[in-house]
Amino acid sequence: MVEVDSRKQLLYDPIVRLSGIADKFVMQDATSSNMKVSLQECIDTLANYQDECKKLKRNEPTLSPSERYSIYESAYIYYKIIHIMVLTRIPSLPQFSSAKSSDATNEDKELMQIYNMLVKTLLSDEKIAQIKSYLRANYPDKNSKGKESIVNKQLLNNEVFMLPLSGSPISAVQLNHLIQMYDSSLLLIDVRPRAEFDSKHIKAKSVICVEPVSFKNSFTDLEVEKKSLITSPQKEIALFQARDKYNYIVIYTQQSEKTQFYMHQQLVLLDILMNKSFAKPLNEKNIKVFTLDKGFSGWVSKKGACETTTQNGDAIYISGNTSSLNLQNLPQLSPNIGSSMDKSMRDMMSTSADFEGRTYQLPQQQQPVFARTPSFKNLFNKAKSSSTSSVTSSSPAPSQLVRPQTSSMPPLEQNFTQYPETPKLLTQINTNTMPLSQISPISSRAMSPMTKNMLTQSPQLPMKISRTTIGNGAMLDLKPHPDSKPPGQPVPALPQLPHHMTGTYQNLNQPKLDLDFTVGLENMGNSCYMNCIIQCLLSTHELSQIFLNNSYEKHINLNSKLGSKGVLAKYFARLVHTMYREGSFKRPLEKNKPIQPIQFKMACGSINSLFKDNTQQDSQEFCQFLLDGLHEDLNQCGANPPLKELSEDAEKMREKLSMRIASSIEWERFLTTDFSVIVDLFQGQYASQLKCKVCGCTSTTYQTFSVLSVPVPHVSSCHILDCFNEFTKVEKLGTDELWSCPTCKKKQPSTKKLTITRLPRNLIIHLKRFDNMMNKNNVFVKYPFLLDLTPYWANDFDGRLPPGVTDELPTRGQVPPFRYKLNAVASHVGSLYGGHYTAYVNKGINRGWHYFDDTSYRPIKNETECITPNAYVLFYHRVYGV
């Protein structure tokens, strides 16, 4: 466990001792539940804190070491009291909840303005970090043995047993003490991805993993239990269900520059347990909830005991244990039952959690008693007229005040995903040097794996700082700046959620995008196959938007084994930006200069040599390549180890399940190695089932797709549904294809049937017109503007779940009906080697359908021109309520 020296060092930490004194002051005062009085106490204490800071600034050179240290101690205690009052005591008051509501009185609104100003003052304080550093560096026991008059020795020696108030952080020493002495009444909650938890976590009797992407700040404790833990082992679910039976709950996560999202989610979960535990109220039973100071890495550095959890990939089928699946439960990333429209991309285009501009509420505490000063009246009156406030006592200027130690985060601009600059392709054009040796090729489908990277981060809107006099100090006005733009990740400072958060990636004042931009693309030598696919793919507004607002950058995974380290994604984004610049906000018949996508084509050629020269290629193959390549660049799980093959027992168990359930499990298994916005937008799944005609034994495999290839019957004319009938029909295997039945132990007459088990948000249908000999079937396949594929979706759920699984698996949008509207058509005339590709694309209500032939484009001549016998690839988008 914790080493003796490290324990002693933590035990005599002056910050812990002084925090205990501040806690004691707050606990001893229970005189008022009035929010106005509590705010007055905070302002009085703030004045005292600022006076101490002023003393240090004015007189520090003339003070003796003991006098100086005493002032630093007083300053820290005053600050800590304000911290507890503002972030814990006041949010627990009944008046605070009513003041936050939409029907709050004017007086309550003014109180909230003052409260927010106090919070902002805490967040912007730049002196407290220096105070902490000084107290630790100049501790009397360290520099002047015997001079301990400043220190309360009894408090010091008992620090490990004096736990702070609920909602506060505790040290590694204190957690170690709880584990040793109260292990049976202690619950640990690890807020890290399941893979990291399984690899190593704190050793304790009761420890569970709640993945940071599985909950959001609007959840209650019951929603965490029912939704966030749906894929957790039954043992962990049972532990969380018994959360009201413990005396202590400690939440911890990984604390580092790269895990700020985890740290933010730790605060969100703390808020849920302390203020939204409606199913099992923890406050009523006096259960203390803490966070672990310095997190899991701090525990490991102090040699805290850890253990590893090993999981078998087929545990879901054998025991109902879904923990190895690492479900990516992003809020609303896939639409839920009852979605009236497809809104689920909002979080991917924005941030991880949907912040609602609420003030972070923490646990109930009591107030300290301080002598009143007349400053509150001035502040309150000032707030009425100017929404700002003043305090009579002086304070250090904001430039001198620092965030508290809980928020030693890097600058925001350092939080974006850093990926290598792509090669200067233009230089290579000029020098005719094509190879980009540093780019790793994407040679196959994205079936690789990882330790899940942080999926989404939550930006905090920069605040417009308007200063008004507060004595000689300053207060800050919490108004979003109209020009502010969301940075990459949150910087959690104090245990408090950021104010004025945005729920969408587009800023409040960001101009609306014209996602139906229209521009031609130059043919660079048989590149029509590329041009038509680009035009068709960009009919998907969600895809265009994440590249136009650059949110894709935050999802680039440098560790993805099959990715190009962002090269393909970056050059695709540049192309989309260029097309948008030339083709957006144009009048219906206004023409513009065509775009030459030469750099994008060279990037594609550097990744896959098939697209390097000027030979004609199959547009469907390019579409598959582009989607796979973008997926691998943005694959959040691209470095995970591959899933183990199912055991024979697990396969038998899977065959007993309905395809609806088995396919859902396989989809979750797939997401542990492949998770990206491309998956969410375009990927579906089908089942391939072999069946022995002698004994009836079956074997089913599940395959994902982003482009669904359906056969075209050799008839004079057919409908697209005929192609789906052909795709899903029972096929009798020939003599040379007989299946070796595991039950009969020999090859037997057998059949094969494909069943669509997951229909994606955007369905790309490839009409297989070419056979193995490259002969083309030119039959006119009729396809509608509105396509209903509900009858082809596996809907065979019989109520059975794997043993041990009591809750349904996530639907992830797989709720009928499945209706699609036609968005685009890639057409082909001629042979595979000597033909030409063009595109029909729906450019929205204002522009209507357009025909694209490389550089030229025009509105279609009549309503049905886009229903062409030359159709080769169809692009459909799912619609609701039609």
Curated annotation (Swiss-Prot):
Q: Where is the Rhodanese domain positioned along the sequence?
A: 182-308
Alphabetized SMART domains for the sequence:
RHOD
Q: Which InterPro entries match?
A: Papain-like_cys_pep_sf, Peptidase_C19_UCH, Rhodanese-like_dom, Rhodanese-like_dom_sf, Ub_carboxyl-term_hydrolase, USP_CS, USP_dom
Q: Show the GO cellular component annotation of the record.
A: late endosome membrane; proteasome complex
Q: Under which EC number(s) is this enzyme classified? A: 3.4.19.12
An annotated Gene Ontology molecular function = cysteine-type deubiquitinase activity
Feature: compositional bias, Low complexity? 382-399
Q: Can you cite a GO biological process for this protein?
A: regulation of DNA replication
Catalytic residues identified in the record: 528 (nucleophile), 836 (proton acceptor)
Topology versus the membrane, per the UniProt entry? Peripheral membrane protein
Its keywords, alphabetically, are: Cytoplasm, Endosome, Hydrolase, Membrane, Protease, Thiol protease, Ubl conjugation pathway
Group of enzyme by EC:
hydrolase
Q: Which reaction does it catalyse?
A: Thiol-dependent hydrolysis of ester, thioester, amide, peptide and isopeptide bonds formed by the C-terminal Gly of ubiquitin (a 76-residue protein attached to proteins as an intracellular targeting signal)
Any inhibitors or activators noted? RFU1 is an inhibitor of deubiquitination activity.
Q: Which family does it belong to?
A: Belongs to the peptidase C19 family.
Please explain the role this protein plays, according to its UniProt record: Ubiquitin thioesterase that acts at the late endosome/prevacuolar compartment to recover ubiquitin from ubiquitinated membrane proteins en route to the vacuole. Also removes ubiquitin from soluble proteins targeted to proteasomes. Is essential to maintain a normal level of free ubiquitin. Required for promoting coordination of DNA replication and avoids DNA overreplication.
Q: What is this protein called?
A: Ubiquitin carboxyl-terminal hydrolase 4
Organism of origin: Vanderwaltozyma polyspora (strain ATCC 22028 / DSM 70294 / BCRC 21397 / CBS 2163 / NBRC 10782 / NRRL Y-8283 / UCD 57-17) (Kluyveromyces polysporus)
